Amino acid sequence: MANKFTRQQISEFREQFSVYDKNGDGHITTEEFGAVMRSLGLNLTQAELQEEINDSDLDGDGTINFTEFLCAMAKDTYSEKDLKKDFRLFDIDKNGFISAAEMRYVRTILRWKQTDEEIDEIIKAADVDGDGQINYREFARLMMAKNQGHDTKYDTTGGTLERDLAAGVAKNIIAAPMTDFIKNLFEALFS
């Protein structure tokens, strides 16, 4: 189901779009998308980059325009493959955990406006085992809880990852670009 965006959200999405649209021509190419991913330490192959672009390229021109970007932002379901990609995006040092410092780094690169305190709140909300960082299971549980309409600020422990993923598959999950995941994570925790 597509979301109806507020003017503020559209403005924020336009700013996010400009992070990727380096030359300002109104289209995100695989090269531009790849440059942002590499700046975050994620070295996707050309085929993976093209697949990410194709997931949102509604008119088939090989790029993502702002309207297509908004459509991608409106998607609210994800696949396990996308969960893993997004987890890798945040896990800068590739140690299997997302720290507050890594989340702040991604925030800086993608020009998000969350404060350090809000980042700490995200970590605390997702950190089920209390070790001060987010492992993959905690990340997936947080995203699946958000996906199923739970209040992710307080409900991150309900169910198992396997059950949550099975529920998602049963709903015919539609693959969404990783920027969609990350943006929705921040919006879900602070809306």
Curated annotation (Swiss-Prot):
Domain EF-hand: 8-43, 44-73, 78-113, 114-149
Keyword match Metal-binding: yes
Induction: By touch.
Tissue note: Specifically expressed in leaves.
Its biological purpose: Potential calcium sensor.
Originating organism: Arabidopsis thaliana
Name this polypeptide is given: Calmodulin-like protein 10
InterPro entries named in the record: CALM/Myosin/TropC-like, EF-hand-dom_pair, EF_Hand_1_Ca_BS, EF_hand_dom
